[in-house]
């Protein structure tokens, strides 16, 4: 049963919806608390009853945007899928959702990219949470013999670099038409089939040599 909303909760939700509309329409740079108060039909002083600062409001917008992506991560990690399938779904479901958001409204998507750049300290906690859940999947994979010789932190760093375009909305936005879940599946297969600490000869022992 859903928890009954207080007047404060309802007011915060209504203001958040207005703020999301404003961000999606024209980004966050020109936004002021006075303007939002005017749009909401209240005084600026009253607005501060619901959000104590502009930063608190941006934090609520970030939480609103990330909430469904966090739910995806939680559900995938809690599933009984094998590690390879689990890692694919961990990325694929979030990518599919973000791609649909981009297809629905590229301008709004770009506004969220800019919001993330302007307020990266608000985004960092969600990046860290993603690494936490990825570490859990990597740990399961290592228990089955994958990623031999690597520490969990090393594996996280490498996998983040390999899969970055599928979760980093700034990078994703630039090449979205070239990204697909089919390509992602091949990437995850390559990660599981080859990622380890073993030196297979790619790095020369005596520096670069001319062709």
Q: What is the meaning of each model-derived region?
A:
Residues 67-70, 97, 117-144, 153-158, ...:
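Amphipathic alpha-helical packing segments from all-alpha helical-bundle domains
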Residues 40-51:
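Short hydrophobic/aromatic patch on the recognition helix
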Residues 2, 89, 132-143, 161-211:
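C-terminal peripheral helix-coil segments that are non-catalytic and often amphipathic
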Residues 86, 98-118, 135, 168-171:
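Amphipathic alpha-helical segments used for helix-helix packing
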Residues 60, 64, 74-100, 156-159, ...:
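Hydrophobic alpha-helical connector segments
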Residues 1-26, 30-39, 56-59:
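Basic, helix-initiating cap at the start of DNA-binding domains
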Residues 11, 54, 61, 65, ...:
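Hydrophobic/aromatic residues within well-ordered alpha-helical segments
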């Amino acid at each position: 049963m859903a928890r009954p909303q207080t007047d404060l909760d309802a007011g915060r939700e209504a203001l958040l919806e207005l703020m999301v509309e404003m961000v999606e329409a024209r980004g966050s740079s020109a936004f002021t608390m006075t303007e939002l108060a005017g749009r909401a039909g209240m005084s600026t002083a009253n607005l501060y009853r619901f959000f104590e600062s502009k930063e608190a409001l941006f934090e609520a917008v970030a939480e609103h945007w990330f909430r469904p992506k966090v739910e995806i991560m939680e559900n995938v990690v809690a599933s009984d899928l094998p590690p390879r399938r689990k890692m694919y779904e961990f990325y694929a479901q979030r990518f599919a959702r973000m791609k649909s958001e981009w297809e629905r409204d590229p301008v709004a998507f770009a506004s969220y990219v800019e919001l993330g750049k302007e307020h990266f300290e608000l985004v960092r906690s969600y990046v860290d949470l993603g690494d936490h859940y990825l570490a859990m999947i990597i740990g399961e994979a290592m228990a089955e013999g994958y990623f031999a010789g690597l520490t969990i932190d090393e594996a996280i760093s490498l996998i983040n670099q390999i899969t970055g375009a599928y979760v980093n909305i700034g990078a994703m936005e630039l090449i979205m038409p070239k990204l697909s879940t089919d390509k992602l599946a091949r990437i995850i297969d390559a990660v599981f089939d080859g990622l380890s600490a073993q030196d297979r000869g790619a790095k020369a022992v005596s520096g670069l040599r001319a062709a």
